[in-house]
């Protein structure tokens, strides 16, 4: 796999737009990913599963679902949170701040997290049970010490792109399927940015888990629906 230093963009908790994510049972047939589809596996790392530094509830349950999905895709991209020590998104970088409080950085509001996914640590490693034989690219994000990164496509400053959109378009990709952790943060912002970049986008709900911080999960689904993201289950994909 190629390692591409990846930037992404921050999404603070924001108010939800109207609408609800569209379940795929409304569609006529099961989806069959072709050569123009990519599976994006977002941040399935030790830090985000039980026992990690920022565990997402039942985060490890996404691994077998993603492994079942993988053989249906000729193209897979993986993202990996890859923070510097003392990162600006860590509560420990500020006097008197606690995890899950917010602060204001130069690009806007920032949720403060426990120290997590520090470069080179086992905490930042991809989950050992992931089986992604057709993965071609790992995008590392959050390595800029002063900017958080959620989306696989843009950094939090909303100015710096990662190059992923160009990479996918150069390979003829038209449709993106997003899985991983966490639904209401990195998954949601990756999906919305995929639509922004001109791709059709599906979030595979049972291949994701959420943090759900102060209603962030419901807000994220509404925001995604408003941007054109479709909400599906792994069973909606042919061959899974």
What does each of the following model-derived ranges do?
Residues 49-57:
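Acidic/histidine-rich helix-loop elements
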Residues 24-49:
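C-terminal segment of N-terminal export signals and the immediately downstream linker at the start
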Residues 205-214:
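Short, flexible loop segments at boundaries between secondary-structure elements
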Residues 77-80, 202-206:
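Short internal beta-strands
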Residues 2, 8-27:
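N-terminal export signals
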Residues 132, 215-240:
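Structural recognition of alpha->loop->beta junctions
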Residues 64-175:
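Active-site alpha/beta core segments
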């Amino acid at each position: 796999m190629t390692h591409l230093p990846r930037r992404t963009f921050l999404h603070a908790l924001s108010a939800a737009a109207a609408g609800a994510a569209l379940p795929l049972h409304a569609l006529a047939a099961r989806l069959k990913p072709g050569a123009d589809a990519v599976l994006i596996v977002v941040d399935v790392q030790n830090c985000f599963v039980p026992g990690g530094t920022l565990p997402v509830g039942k985060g490890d349950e996404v691994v077998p679902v993603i492994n079942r999905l993988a053989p249906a895709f000729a193209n897979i991209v993986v993202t990996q949170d890859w923070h510097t020590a003392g990162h600006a998104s860590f509560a420990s970088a500020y006097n008197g701040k606690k995890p899950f409080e917010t602060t204001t950085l130069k690009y806007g509001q920032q949720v403060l997290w426990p120290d997590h996914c520090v470069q080179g640590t086992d905490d930042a490693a991809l989950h050992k049970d992931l089986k992604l034989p057709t993965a071609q690219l790992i995008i590392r994000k959050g390595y800029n010490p002063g900017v958080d990164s959620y989306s696989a496509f843009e950094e939090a400053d909303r100015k710096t792109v990662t190059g992923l959109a160009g990479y996918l378009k150069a390979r003829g990709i038209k449709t993106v399927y997003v899985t991983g952790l966490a639904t209401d943060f990195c998954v949601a912002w990756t999906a919305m940015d995929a639509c922004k970049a001109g791709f059709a986008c599906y979030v595979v709900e049972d291949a994701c888990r959420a943090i759900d911080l102060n209603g962030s999960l419901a807000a994220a689904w509404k925001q995604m629906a408003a941007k054109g993201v479709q909400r599906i289950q792994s069973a909606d994909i042919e061959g899974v």
